[in-house]
Amino acid sequence: MCEIVVITGGEPAIHNLHDLAYELRIRNLPIHIETCGAYPIIGEMDWITISPKNLALPIEENLALADEFKIIVEDETSIQHWTNKIDFAQIGVPTWLHPEWSCSKDESVL
């Protein structure tokens, strides 16, 4: 039995998710989306994770909707890079740090 639906992979917010979200909602399934935040999220979501990317920065409306942030840590400068671009403390939601998997053996990333 499905307990939650997570929409992720590529960039899900480039699609109009209204109909999908509606169909999931009438089945009482919670909906979680993970997005870079650069495109408007069309459709009602229960949880929004913003994982920002340099090539497509999050738009303000999505920063306000975020339930959490996921920052990919590629090297020792990654955290400072993103804190210079986004005021995570002011937004006030959890921020998770994830090592970039190709760098996961690099202790400076951990």
Label for each model-derived stretch:
Residues 1-7:
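Glycine/small-residue-rich loop that forms an oxyanion/phosphate-binding "nest" at active or ligand-binding sites
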Residues 4, 13-110:
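Conserved AdoMet/S-adenosylmethionine-binding subsite of the radical SAM
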